[in-house]
Amino acid sequence: GMLFTATSLFSQVNISAGSTVTQNFDGLGTSATATLPTGWKVDKNNSVRSVGTYSGAGTATELIAGNNMSSSAQNGIYNFGAGVATSATDRAIGGISSGSASKSVNVYVQLTNNGTTSINNFTIGFDVEKYRNGKNSAGFTIQMYYSTDGSTWTSAGNDFKVSFVADANTDGYTSAPGATTSISGKTLSQSLAAGSSLYLAWNYSVTSGSTTSSAQALGIDNVS
């Protein structure tokens, strides 16, 4: 069975050996300035493929989008809806770059081992959903990172990377998301002692180079 454990007394997501944590972001609701679930944070910066710090990140989105996302959509942090942005119940979190801003959007979670035994490794899955095409020739990627302190990050590698190749246009989708790629059951070989925290970050950015115009809009969903 799936168990999402969080407490209002602490700002992290609690986990213990053998337990499962899931998050589908549907609790975001339909507000552009939606508050993230406990233990989750988000930020944006103007450097490509750059992860910030968990402590410095915020706890709310800035914008919403869903069906028919505009080719001139504002850059920033999005609460995406699978369907009509203002009413869809299935939500995801992510963003979109412009040529000069939001070159990276990062979604973070702090996992704290509140059990009595060490966790030897983590089995992780997540979906990457595409809410708008982008004709930037490099394409866009979501890459997961991990950290023991929330500020120094290590790439989790290709098993935790989803890239989309360039599209012919920057159109939205009549029925969003227009594409979904799932990462399922991949092992992150990182131990976590009782009482300690592990931080994960999902970085959205252009796949290569530094040109971020004509971007694809990507979000993450169904983290487990």
What are these model-predicted stretches?
Residues 1-8:
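Bacterial N-terminal signal peptides
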Residues 8-28:
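Boundary/junction segments of secreted and surface-exposed precursor proteins
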Residues 20-22, 104-108, 121-123:
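Intrinsic-disorder/low-complexity, polar/charged segments enriched in Ser/Thr/Lys/Arg/Asp/Glu/Gln
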Residues 25, 100-102, 114-119, 126-129, ...:
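Terminal, low-complexity interaction segments
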Residues 31-36:
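Short, solvent-exposed loop/turn elements at domain surfaces
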Residues 45-117, 218:
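Surface-exposed, low-complexity/disordered Ser/Thr/Gly/Pro/Asn-rich loops and linkers
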Residues 142-144:
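Short beta-strand elements bearing conserved aromatic residues within extracellular beta-rich modules
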